[in-house]
A protein has these predicted regions:
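Short Fe-S-cluster ligation motifs
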Residues: 56-71, 95-103
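Arg/Lys-rich, low-complexity, intrinsically disordered N-terminal tails that contact nucleic acids
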Residues: 1-10, 85-103
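Short, charged surface segments at domain edges that flank catalytic/cofactor-binding sites
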Residues: 1-34
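Generic alpha-helical hydrophobic packing signal
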Residues: 21-22, 27-30, 45, 66-72
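Short, flexible micro-motifs
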Residues: 5, 59-60, 80
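Short Cys/His-centered divalent metal-binding micro-motifs
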Residues: 34, 65-91
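Histidine-centered nuclease catalytic patch
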Residues: 33-67
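Bulky hydrophobic/aromatic packing residues
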Residues: 26-27, 37, 100-103
Length: 103
């Protein structure tokens, strides 16, 4: 029997991760997490492995696990990414092109 299906251990890990620093911030996009959303919602909270299980990561090692949005986790897939990999670039949302060459 694999460790991946042990939902009680994963839920306990989710509670521990919530208590750590940045427990309310998505590890990949650095945006706030909403724990009240239903499980299938794109912005619901999931546990993601920094080194995916498919690449040898341990799904029950708290150092390898982080809280993320469901959509960020689906986008990541089976890749190893660093913290904030999907964070918007500084000033990207507020800066508007000043000339047509920048469009």
């Amino acid at each position: 029997m694999g460790t991946r299906g042990n939902s009680r251990r994963r839920e306990a890990m989710k509670r521990r991760l919530m208590m750590l620093d940045d427990g309310d911030i998505c590890w990949l996009c650095l945006r706030p997490l909403d724990f009240s959303l239903p499980a299938k919602h794109p912005l619901s909270v999931e546990i993601d492995e920094e080194v995916p299980v498919g690449l040898g990561g341990d799904p029950l090692d708290i150092e390898n696990c982080h809280l993320v949005h469901r959509a960020c986790n689906l986008r990541k897939g089976c890749k190893v990414l660093h913290r904030g990999a999907y964070a918007p670039a500084a000033g990207a949302a507020t800066r508007r092109p000043s000339t047509s060459r920048e469009w």
